[in-house]
Structure formats: C-alpha cells, structure tokens
Amino acid sequence: MNIPADLLYTKDHEWIKVLDDGTTALVGITDFAQSELGDIVFVETKPVGTELSEHDVFGTVEAVKTVADLFAPVDGVIVEVNEALDAAEVVNSSPYEDGWMVKVSLKDASQFDALMSAAEYSEMVGE
C-alpha cells in the first residue's frame, strides 16, 4: 500500500497536502480507503465556495458496493474541485496524484497538529 511521507492523514482515511503557497491544500482519500471501497464509480463534492469546518462532510464517494462520506481534515473553503473526478475510477488508479478531490483555502494551520504522519497512519491501518 502506498502511504506518501509528504502528506498528513486523518483517522477517516483522508489525506491533505499543503501546496507550495502555504495557503491552500489538496484533499483526497488514501490508497487504503480506495482499496477498501473497491471500484469507485462516482464522486460528488460540495461546490467551490463552500466553507468547511474540520470533520464536515464535503462529499461522497460511491463504489460498486457502498457509499462513503468524505470528511474535511481541517477548516477551509473549497476553491477548486478536481474535474478529473468525472472519470471516478481515477481515485482507484491514482488516489494521491490525479484523484485528489478538492483544493481548499486554509484557515488555521495549527489544525495540522492533530493529523497523523505517514508513519502514524501506516501503524493505524496495520501496514
């Protein structure tokens, strides 16, 4: 299983990557999550401009057998939705690169302290 060291993780199997500008971040689901869900057929997110609080549901992922909520790892505002999600299977094939869900404008960087490192996430999922 792929667990990139440069990302932070939640217990709900989302990842977040702060971009070089330091004010925005990409959010998606982990390789573990996509493998547990199986073949993803549809992804729906809230629209650009939606304000999120940590743990808010910002969308859903529909797989052949189940539907799962997507949870915001931090407070922020959705500033972009990944258009590649129109082909939802990209989440299975590239969860950390092409399959990101939303880009958020960050509000409080101190919230990162509550997120897990790659090593902590790996331990949580038993890798």
Swiss-Prot record:
N6-lipoyllysine modified-residue sites: K65
Domain of life: Bacteria
Pfam families recorded: GCV_H
Gene3D superfamilies for this protein: 2.40.50.100
Domain Lipoyl-binding: 24-105
PROSITE patterns membership: BIOTINYL_LIPOYL (PS50968), LIPOYL (PS00189)
Cofactor, free-text remark: Binds 1 lipoyl cofactor covalently.
Named cofactor requirement(s): (R)-lipoate
Key words of the record: Lipoyl
CDD domains with a match to the protein in the record: GCS_H (cd06848)
InterPro entries, per the entry: 2-oxoA_DH_lipoyl-BS, Biotin_lipoyl, GCV_H, GCV_H/Fam206, GCV_H_sub, Single_hybrid_motif
GO terms classed as biological process: glycine decarboxylation via glycine cleavage system
One term under GO cellular component: glycine cleavage complex
NCBIfam families per UniProt: gcvH, PRK01202.1
Family: Belongs to the GcvH family.
PANTHER family linked to this entry: GLYCINE CLEAVAGE SYSTEM H PROTEIN (PTHR11715), GLYCINE CLEAVAGE SYSTEM H PROTEIN-RELATED (PTHR11715:SF3)
Role this protein plays: The glycine cleavage system catalyzes the degradation of glycine. The H protein shuttles the methylamine group of glycine from the P protein to the T protein.
UniProt subunit comment: The glycine cleavage system is composed of four proteins: P, T, L and H.
The protein's name: Glycine cleavage system H protein
